[in-house]
Amino acid sequence: MSLKKRYRETIQPKLQKDLSLTNIHEVPKVLKVTVNRGLGEAAANAKSLEASVNELAQITGQKVVVTRAKKAIAGFKIRQGMPIGCAVTLRGDRMYAFLERLINLALPRIRDFRGVSPKSFDGRGNYTLGVREQIIFPEISFDKIDAIRGMDITIVTTARSDEEGRALLREMGMPFQSN
């Protein structure tokens, strides 16, 4: 059963009961997933940016947007408009497919994995996790990468509090650390 179907049929009614909500539309849901990668070396090395864009496109299955510097910062040797990273925003079916792959395939492949931190919520029910290596995703072959790079994954929800967001992600199968 796909994650989207499981959310509609089992997770949504269970959360409505657990959070004692009167309307099904009050139940928190995932709005979007943003995958972001900041590349300090992209200012000097254009190949690293190209490789990074290709990797993110493989992982997410969607076109990648190159992020550019808003201001020049001499200390970092960047000028305004220079490419300094890349990002992808996933919504709808692609978002659910990515979350399913992240939870069931990628996260368990992290070395010494004991669960993700339950403290990485932002106060409004959104969750951010950092991944140190891109090779945890099955789409990336270890032989074809030039360097190990990480990424930030932000899961934006309609939850009104961290507790609601945590309940939603726990029901979806997110492996949180137990103290």
UniProtKB/Swiss-Prot annotation:
Q: Write down the Gene3D superfamilies for this protein, in alphabetical order.
A: 3.30.1440.10
Biological process annotations from GO: translation
Gene Ontology CC entries for this record = ribonucleoprotein complex; ribosome
Judging by the UniProt lineage, the source's domain of life is Bacteria
What are the protein's UniProt keywords? Ribonucleoprotein, Ribosomal protein, RNA-binding, rRNA-binding, tRNA-binding
A single Gene Ontology MF term assigned here is: structural constituent of ribosome
* Keyword RNA-binding belongs to the record: yes
Q: Which family is this sequence assigned to? A: Belongs to the universal ribosomal protein uL5 family.
Q: What does this protein do?
A: This is one of the proteins that bind and probably mediate the attachment of the 5S RNA into the large ribosomal subunit, where it forms part of the central protuberance. In the 70S ribosome it contacts protein S13 of the 30S subunit (bridge B1b), connecting the 2 subunits; this bridge is implicated in subunit movement. Contacts the P site tRNA; the 5S rRNA and some of its associated proteins might help stabilize positioning of ribosome-bound tRNAs.
Description of how the protein assembles with itself and partners: Part of the 50S ribosomal subunit; part of the 5S rRNA/L5/L18/L25 subcomplex. Contacts the 5S rRNA and the P site tRNA. Forms a bridge to the 30S subunit in the 70S ribosome.
Which named protein is this? Large ribosomal subunit protein uL5
Q: Which organism is it from?
A: Synechococcus sp. (strain CC9605)
> Which classification does the entry list for the species?
Bacteria, Bacillati, Cyanobacteriota, Cyanophyceae, Synechococcales
Gene encoding the protein: rplE
